[in-house]
Amino acid sequence: MTVNAMPDDRELALAPLDEKVDHVRGSQAGHLIIEYGDYECPYSRQAFRAIELVERQLGGNLRFAFRHFPLTGIHPHALAAAAAAEAAAVQGRFWDLHELLFHRQKALQDSDLRGYAAQLGLDVAAFDRDRAGRSVADRIRRDVDSGLASG
């Protein structure tokens, strides 16, 4: 039995981009890449590097969105890292922490995450509050649900 098998009649749909909710960068006129990623996953890190390369090559012709998909069964720090990225987003620094998390993928302990927040000049007390809060958990759940619905 395959755990991830889906019935043949299940309709798959990618949730449309929501500029008010999704983390999006790049030109509105550019090609769109939506990544569902996990900060602790080596394959997500490979995708991160590939997207960096494509962004450099296409310049203003790429639009990129990142959605969380922490694989908590195999990556014990993935959910905490996603929550940290969302807490950084509250302070307007999502993309900065996003990049830092992938560059330092082997260092995702709580003390590391707090250190990254301080390094970026975030209000660490607010960062801690936000990453433990309901809205951050709901945001991550929304992304995971969207990823599951997308197949």
Label each PLM-derived region with a short phrase.
Residues 32-119, 123, 128:
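Structural alpha/beta surface segment adjacent to cysteine/selenocysteine redox centers
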Residues 1-73, 136-151:
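Extracytoplasmic thiol/disulfide redox context detector
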Residues 125-137:
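Metal-dependent phosphoesterase signature
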